């Protein structure tokens, strides 16, 4: 990183289920801590050691992640091709999801980068806030349940992630194949327009 950064503390994380290989369900990962104070490293190691370790299959998957095929191995070209395809598809889907949500009324979405999820924010209409209050649920929960009931699309309310009070988000994945994702986003758009019309 260059001499000007040689003393900066840096932590890097990698996960088998959240990396570009996307092997969801395998609970494996690592943390690399560079330039951390030795006392902090000891506490980090204690904390990590006190937790349950990954299953054998998760550890095996992690070994594959950190030891990909090398150029001298027969599977290398296929590995590179598949990796580039996966990363290219994720980039395309991230752009599609971000642009679609940002094109909707009363919705904004940060650029999806480095994750397989988007966290759009909804500028909730006052009538929707009132209805949610009557139902005794957070407005984002009401939105997500109505979305599920009317479209079959399952997203996670932002209130489950500790969002700032007075803001309303949801989390959705960008993992479905491109064609299914396009279809889902169109159904989402129709629902969102109807939701805004209902609670205008």
Regions found by a protein language model. Give the residues of each.
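PLP-dependent class I/II
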Residues: 1-200
